[in-house]
Regions:
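Structural signal for hydrophobic packing residues in well-ordered secondary-structure cores
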Residues: 37, 41, 56-63, 67, ...
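N-terminal Rossmann-like NAD(P)+-binding subdomain of aldehyde/semialdehyde dehydrogenases
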Residues: 1-112
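Rossmann-like NAD(P) dinucleotide-binding subdomain of oxidoreductase/dehydrogenase enzymes
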Residues: 104-246, 367
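Short loop/turn microsegments at loop-to-beta-strand junctions
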Residues: 1-4, 266, 384
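ALDH superfamily catalytic-core signature
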Residues: 210-347, 410
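Short, well-ordered beta-strand elements within core beta-sheets of diverse protein domains
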Residues: 16-21, 36-42, 126, 236-239, ...
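Conserved C-terminal structural/oligomerization subdomain of aldehyde/semialdehyde dehydrogenase
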Residues: 11-17, 200, 237, 291, ...
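Residue-level signal for inorganic ion chemistry
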Residues: 12, 48, 70, 92, ...
Length: 454
């Protein structure tokens, strides 16, 4: 069995070595999960709900431990990491109400009774990215477990620590052995085996659009169920009638949060031409005051990028001759630091405007009117999130209906609430996570007719 050295992105120092599973180990754990499914699906709804609530409670008890582990492994700010651990707790609590509410229906038919049942799929393979290791894991495993499935989860190779700890806490909560399994390993080994092993009945994948397409092709061989949350290049649209100062103050966090390593990052900033200079003045002040520092500091608003390789990739998007409007600050010394960077763009075909950089870089472009803003915003292969800033309620409704994105926010930059649906249009994904409808993605509907004339 090979190993991988986890690196602290804040210091570039090694943290610990993690054993990586091979194909044989992966198959063995998948088989274990398949065996556990037969008993887990038959745990009474009330008892399954109690176990999930207990799991949530134990995660809450370990919030600070999990948060500090994420700061160490991922470079997330301590404030964000606490929220992320809390989100796992909240998602578990939310879906703990589901086992007792997996309602079927009684459908009127002649000469009999027709009923439907919501039945679990079996083993669910959850493949988690490195940008939000804890919450995205929870978005997959919580509804899957609530619906009576078992889970095999592959954390990203570079950020496995919190997932491993969550699996330990699940056992502590009384979740039976084999029901929730974490398998550290390479995507080309463990992730690929999730796709090809017929015992895995569904894949939940969050990551790049390119890899998502490969997984989609692989799943087609077995008509394997699939949920995808992929790339984004979200638009932050500022109209002239907006609260300009408020919009500018919120814009840095909308794109630089988590060092821009967020599929929902508003990395395209569309500003109405008549207010461009005024907005940019407020925006520059906000960017220069954005606190990029040791993520363990309570005051930190942004930490480092995840790896040296990713830092090099982001650097490629901002060459020496790039049209930089202004930058924020960054620490000196070790670690994978990149200063918040604002680029002025005049061409929608500019590479920085079209491609997902996945770093603290935002491209600013102007628009003339409402129709122009909609056209520019929709000129993207992605459609995950976005913001609309306007005091005109009619305009806000019109634009929000016209923008091709799955998660929009008016006069704010929010994207995710665990009790509302989350997912993308176009090449940003397939299906929805979170909210009341996500559970349907982890069940099959069975229809049964009873002939009462027999």
């Amino acid at each position: 069995m090979s190993t991988f050295t986890v690196i602290n992105p804040t210091t570039a120092a090694p943290v610990k070595d993690i054993a990586l599973a091979g194909i044989e180990e992966t198959d063995a754990i998948i088989s274990k999960a398949a065996r556990a499914f037969e008993s887990w699906r038959n745990v009474t709804p009330g008892d399954r709900a109690k176990l999930l609530r207990k799991f949530a409670s134990i995660v809450d008890d370990h919030n600070e431990e999990l948060a500090k582990l994420e700061v160490l492994n991922s470079g997330h700010t301590i404030g964000n990491a606490r929220w992320e651990a809390g989100n796992v707790r909240d998602v578990l609590n939310y879906y703990s109400a589901a086992p007792e509410r997996l309602f079927g229906r009684q459908i009127p038919v002649p000469n009999g009774i027709d009923v439907t049942f919501k039945e679990p799929l079996g083993v669910i393979g959850v493949i988690v990215p490195w940008n939000f290791p804890m919450p995205i894991a929870g978005w997959g495993f919580a509804p899957a477990l609530a619906a009576g499935n078992t889970v095999v989860l592959k954390p990203a190779e570079v950020t496995p620590l919190t997932a491993i700890r969550l699996a330990e806490l699940a056992l502590e909560a009384g979740i039976p052995d084999g029901v929730f399994n974490v398998i550290p390993g390479k995507g080309s080994v463990v992730g690929e085996r999730f796709v090809t092993n017929p015992l895995v009945r569904k894949i939940v994948f969050t990551g790049s659009t390119q890899v998502g397409k490969e997984i989609m092709r692989g799943c087609s061989n077995q008509v394997k169920r699939l949920t995808l949350e992929l790339g984004g290049k979200s638009a932050n649209i500022i109209f002239s009638d907006a609260d300009i100062e408020k919009a500018a103050a919120g814009a840095p966090g909308a794109v630089f949060d988590n060092a821009g390593q967020d599929c929902c990052a508003r990395s395209r900033l569309l500003v109405q031409k008549s207010i461009y200079e005024k907005f940019m003045g407020y925006f520059e002040r906000a960017v220069k005051n954005f606190k990029v520092e040791d993520p363990a500091n309570e005051s930190a608003e942004m930490g480092p990028l995840i790896t040296a390789a990713h830092l090099a990739r982001v650097n490629e998007y901002v060459p020496d001759d790039a049209k930089v409007a202004f930058r924020g600050n960054k620490p000196t010394g070790p670690g994978y630091w990149f200063a918040p960077t604002v680029l002025e763009v005049n061409d929608v075909n500019d590479r920085t405007y079209r491609e997902e950089i996945f770093g603290p870089v935002v491209s600013v472009i102007t628009f003339e009117d409402e129709a122009d803003a909609i056209r520019i915003a929709n000129d993207s292969e992605f459609g995950l999130s976005g913001s609309i800033w306007s005091r005109d309620i009619g305009r806000s409704v019109r634009v929000s209906r016209a923008i091709e994105a799955g998660n929009l926010s008016v006069n704010s930059n929010s994207s995710v609430r665990y009790w509302t649906p989350f997912g993308g249009y176009k090449q940003s994904g397939l299906g929805r996570e979170l909210g009341p409808d996500a559970l349907d993605a982890f069940t099959e509907t069975k229809n049964v007719f009873f002939d009462t004339n027999s």
